[in-house]
Amino acid sequence: MQMYPVEQAALVELEAGLARREAAQPAAEAPRKAGGVALHVRQVVKRYDGREVLHNVALDVAPGEFLAIVGRSGCGKSTLLRLVAGLEAADGGSITVDGESAAKGRARHADVRVMFQDARLLPWKRVLDNVALGLPRTRRGEAADVLAQVGLADRAREWPARLSGGQRQRVALARALVHHPQLLLLDEPLGALDALTRIEMQGLIESLWRRLGFTALLVTHDVSEAVALADRIVLIEDGRIAMDERVALARPRERGAAGFAQLEAAVLKRVMRQAPQAQVPSHAGAHADPAATTAPLNVSWAA
């Protein structure tokens, strides 16, 4: 994967920031207790260049719940995830994570982790060192334990460039989970993987979520993925919540089952019901949902 200078500079800054944080941590720091947190979104508004991308969005997610957000490209779903993560500030309304504001710069970094479509591994660090970023030295052994949980114990000393796309995403997942997040934000994390690898990763994410109990918020274009993983599926259309559907299917879910296929078809039909928006001229810029294509460079992604 080609890395542009600005991306490489961001990775260097990330590594330096994590090193500073590690040095400031008490040597005997213990991992946080596992479990999920409540998320409350209240009448949130977000504008780009005067255009509203999110319109009075209101949403509640219970502790330990798995919520999937679907919708067409540019509908605002990635923007909402960035606001929840504290990567950007809303122009109106409020977002709280476990009762604390998620406003830009105030999100509780220790309890929230984000996993993107690009694993964003540091290419000059081996796999185990990527997972251990930000951990105090007394907890480095946990990185190896989590690598084993995602099935990569034998790749600990490999360089990221030698891994497949699915393996890199497993490392990114391990890097997030080693910090015991109480809220895991997933922004199309499996979008670049082949179909079989996607299904394997979905099973891995579900099994770890069920065991660890964190709250999960998944943004995806894949309705089948949403049905497979989520307790609820929310559809965003033109910056508004157009559907909030509970998934009343027993786990683990079978894609060939009649109930699974029926719900997938119903949600997909609802997503497709909206007519596509007129294409934005190239000279006008893409302001519909910049978060869908712009990689954040000032955050600790899944680290």
Curated annotation (Swiss-Prot):
Annotated compartments: Cell inner membrane
CC per GO annotation: plasma membrane
Keywords for the protein's UniProt record, in alphabetical order: ATP-binding, Cell inner membrane, Cell membrane, Membrane, Nucleotide-binding, Translocase, Transport
First and last residue of the signal peptide: none
Tagged with keyword Cell inner membrane: yes
Catalytic activity: ATP + H2O + aliphatic sulfonate-[sulfonate-binding protein]Side 1 = ADP + phosphate + aliphatic sulfonateSide 2 + [sulfonate-binding protein]Side 1
Enzyme class, UniProt record, top EC level: translocase
Residue span, ABC transporter domain: 39-263
Keyword Cell inner membrane in record: yes
Top-level taxon in the UniProt lineage: Bacteria
A Pfam family recorded for this sequence: ABC_tran
Oligomeric form and interacting partners: The complex is composed of two ATP-binding proteins (SsuB), two transmembrane proteins (SsuC) and a solute-binding protein (SsuA).
Job description of the protein: Part of the ABC transporter complex SsuABC involved in aliphatic sulfonates import. Responsible for energy coupling to the transport system.
Record-given protein name: Aliphatic sulfonates import ATP-binding protein SsuB
Organism of provenance: Cupriavidus necator (strain ATCC 17699 / DSM 428 / KCTC 22496 / NCIMB 10442 / H16 / Stanier 337)
Source species taxonomy: Bacteria, Pseudomonadati, Pseudomonadota, Betaproteobacteria, Burkholderiales
